[in-house]
Regions:
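Active-site-adjacent structural elements that line small-molecule/cofactor binding pockets in enzymes
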Residues: 1-276
Length: 276
């Protein structure tokens, strides 16, 4: 199992380059950063993990592509990923350029985790009907794939449409960086399979249920695509069982704190996950 870390980087936390250098020093495979453009102060949407007040770091996080660029510049081997990019609320032409540029400057180390978003008010503030957010996500992925793989790209959909365009650079990875669908709902496996995407589920407290979904996904994809698990428990025996079921990567949450506290957690994670 490949092992990575994730962190909410803010204007109050350790810097992106500090965390990235530590992650590489401790021989983690990847660093993942989350994405929110903003958090509406008036909202009805509940976070999947926090029923009450949203943690402070959600309000103050850095732009994911800027922070990942800093991480890439500070490292040589570490894979860098969005965990996840809320693509339903990002312009596909602009985001295609950002992804291709980041993959290019990182020498092909970028992993593109995407999702439709849980915060319905946040999505709505970008002019998207929250009920359409997954349909929008699908069209934006398809449009971006066209931009990445065609010298002269065009796309015609219900939510995304543009005439022939030029856009360089192309991603360094061929045909483009791996796309991982971040989703946990009843249709998550079906949607990942339909998109031809790797699956990036959040951890589910019921190991047996999660394993059954992983096996379902693996059967549908004939092991051609991977499963990356977001923020599972730091329990070696449970991680080994999940690895046996088909999880080939997991990443663990670091505290939004200064670098000394971050390093303490990195050391703990490295110790428990060694040789998985």
């Amino acid at each position: 199992m490949k092992v990575g870390v994730t962190i909410f980087l803010t204007d109050e936390s350790a810097r992106a380059e500090e965390v990235a250098k530590l992650a590489e020093l401790y021989e983690f495979e990847s660093l993942w950063l989350p994405d929110h453009t903003h958090i509406p102060s008036l909202r009805k949407s509940q976070h999947p993990l926090f029923k009450d007040e949203i943690p402070r770091e959600y309000l103050r996080m850095l732009d994911v592509f800027v922070a990942l660029t800093m991480a890439a510049a500070a490292t040589k081997r570490l894979a860098i990923g969005t965990g996840i990019c809320v693509l339903s609320q990002r312009d596909p032409i602009v985001t295609a350029k950002a992804v291709a540029s980041l993959d290019f400057v990182s020498n092909g180390r970028f992993l593109f985790g995407v999702g439709a978003g849980w915060n319905l008010e946040e999505v709505a503030n970008h002019g998207i009907d929250p009920n359409d957010r997954f349909k929008v996500l699908v069209e934006r992925i398809e449009a971006m794939q066209a931009i990445w793989t065609q010298d002269v790209a065009s796309y015609s959909g219900h939510f995304v449409s543009f005439e022939e365009i030029w856009s360089w650079p192309k991603p360094l990875q061929s045909p483009h960086p791996p796309i991982l669908l971040g989703a946990n709902g009843p249709r998550a496996v079906e949607r990942a399979v339909k998109l031809g995407a790797h699956w990036l589920p959040g951890y589910h407290k019921d190991d047996n249920y999660l394993i059954s979904r992983i096996l379902e996904y693996r059967k549908c994809t004939e092991d051609q695509l991977g499963v990356t698990l977001s923020m599972p428990p730091l329990d070696r025996s449970r991680l080994a069982r999940l690895a046996d079921a088909g999880v080939d990567r997991a990443f663990f949450l670091l505290p939004t704190a200064k670098i000394d506290e971050v390093e303490q957690r990195i050391d703990e994670i490295r110790h428990i996950t060694a040789d998985l």
